[in-house]
UniProtKB/Swiss-Prot annotation:
Gene, per the UniProt record: PRNP
Span list, region Interaction with GRB2, ERI3 and SYN1: 16-215
Annotated signal peptide: 1-15
Subunit structure as annotated in this protein's UniProt entry: Monomer and homodimer. Has a tendency to aggregate into amyloid fibrils containing a cross-beta spine, formed by a steric zipper of superposed beta-strands. Soluble oligomers may represent an intermediate stage on the path to fibril formation. Copper binding may promote oligomerization. Interacts with GRB2, APP, ERI3/PRNPIP and SYN1. Mislocalized cytosolically exposed PrP interacts with MGRN1; this interaction alters MGRN1 subcellular location and causes lysosomal enlargement. Interacts with KIAA1191.
GO MF terms, alphabetically ordered: copper ion binding
Official protein name in the record: Major prion protein
GO terms of biological process kind: protein homooligomerization
Function: Its primary physiological function is unclear. Has cytoprotective activity against internal or environmental stresses. May play a role in neuronal development and synaptic plasticity. May be required for neuronal myelin sheath maintenance. May play a role in iron uptake and iron homeostasis. Soluble oligomers are toxic to cultured neuroblastoma cells and induce apoptosis (in vitro). Association with GPC1 (via its heparan sulfate chains) targets PRNP to lipid rafts. Also provides Cu(2+) or Zn(2+) for the ascorbate-mediated GPC1 deaminase degradation of its heparan sulfate side chains.
Region (Disordered): 18-93
GO CC annotations on file: Golgi apparatus; plasma membrane; side of membrane
Family, per entry: Belongs to the prion family.
Amino acid sequence: MLVLFVATWSDLGLCKKRPKPGGWNTGGSRYPGQGSPGGNRYPPQGGGGWGQPHGGGWGQPHGGGWGQPHGGGWGQGGGTHNQWHKPSKPKTSMKHMAGAAAAGAVVGGLGGYMLGSAMSRPLIHFGNDYEDRYYRENMYRYPNQVYYRPVDQYSNQNNFVHDCVNITIKQHTVTTTTKGENFTETDVKMMERVVEQMCITQYEKESQAYYQRGSSMVLFSSPPVILLISFLIFLIVG
């Protein structure tokens, strides 16, 4: 009995001193981030999760958000200086908007000329049947809009019309020739008559609008009107 007791006691002591076999998260692990001394195929990690070289989230090399290489926002290379900024819209003054709406669209590259609204081509008689028939058959080839400058840049109607006719025929001829169509002397003669009538109509329209704008400015700038407007504002605010 004494011998059996001693043998059993020795076996229990040896069991307590015997090391445990390797397992999950123990020495000899092949997975990263354990810091074990034996058999690790990956370099020791700095406290991050799986695949985190420097303590970031999953797949984050330097501690940024998901898919962020250097800690910036989405698509940002590492700081606010690389952020994409939406370009600000250009400011348009009310004065320019009002002028464009009243006078027509300014044409780029023509030195301040504006393009008038489309008009119906006038019915013109040229004094003989051949030219009258030719005009009726070819009038669609002639301009139905004119180029012009503001009326306040001219001293009289004749100067406005002369400039309007020249620039309109020149632009229409260049544009049409580029498309492969040429004009005869008869075409040029008829275009001059047609465009002249349209330029006169445009001058009358622009002159009327110009004087109406001037009258409105004079009306609202008179002292009685200013006093009345100020009184109404005082009543509304008060």
